Amino acid sequence: MNKLQNIRGVAFDLDGTLVDSAPGLAAAVDMALYALELPVAGEERVITWIGNGADVLMERALTWARQERATLRKTMGKPPVDEDIPAEEQVRILRKLFDRYYGEVAEEGTFLFPHVADTLGALHASGLSLGLVTNKPTPFVAPLLESLDIAKYFSVVIGGDDVQNKKPHPEPLLLVASRLGMTPEQMLFVGDSRNDIQAAKAAGCPSVGLTYGYNYGEAIALSEPDVIYDSFNDLLPALGLPHSDNQEIKND
């Protein structure tokens, strides 16, 4: 907790931290797979692939779908499919399809986690500078924040296309700290996955790990963040602000 004593700003991950984006992401992934006549994955499986950006998401989806198709065909006594298109090209095609479909479903398939809006408002009102660091493709980020009515709280927003190296590399966190006018040690980073905690450690930022996110199905404690919270509004007392229980509930 001592690392939280001299905090001047807070930066946040997006997917799995501020928002439950799995419904929209899974829908877009499945529509893209279906368009290529590949097996669809479903939300529960897609959740385990989230966190490293859209290109890696496509690689994971394609690898699984090709293996699943091969297994299904073998079970039915059918020969394997000859892959005329290299995997790299299929990933590129899948990404184009995903971008098209995700643009259609992102807003309706994304929800704020409990306590996020009020807690961000309280942090902003306290004078703390707030930033956002996400591996999500940049074109989707600003419209999503606006649709959720939380864009107004962030002084700096860094998407996955804004840096050469995405999390877990420290580059995006160092960029946000610089733009907020503070040292990494003065900026708390809040996330839900090992990528987030690894990026914070590499950048020299204190970190909070949230237990309710995605994180590839593993406990956030394994990544050893400085602090672990079960609820987003636990940030308030940790930063010397009153803990409000009068918070909004996630709208499913």
Swiss-Prot record:
Pathway(s) the chain acts in: Organic acid metabolism; glycolate biosynthesis; glycolate from 2-phosphoglycolate: step 1/1
Active site: D13
Annotated catalysed reactions: 2-phosphoglycolate + H2O = glycolate + phosphate
InterPro entries: HAD-like_hydrolase_sf, HAD-like_sf, HAD-SF_hydro_IA, HAD_2, HAD_sf, PGP-like_dom2, PGPase_prok
Any Pfam family matching the protein: HAD_2
GO terms classed as biological process: carbohydrate metabolic process; DNA repair; glycolate biosynthetic process
Entry GO terms, CC: cytosol
Binding sites annotated in the UniProt record for Mg(2+): D13, D15, D192
Coiled-coil residue windows: none
Entry keywords, A to Z: Carbohydrate metabolism, Chloride, Hydrolase, Magnesium, Metal-binding
NCBIfam families registered for this protein in UniProt: HAD-SF-IA-v1, HAD-SF-IA-v3, PGP_bact, PRK13222.1-1, PRK13222.1-2, PRK13222.1-4
Subunit: Monomer.
Family stated for the protein in its record: Belongs to the HAD-like hydrolase superfamily. CbbY/CbbZ/Gph/YieH family.
HAMAP family registered for this protein in UniProt: GPH_hydrolase_bact
Protein name in the entry: Phosphoglycolate phosphatase
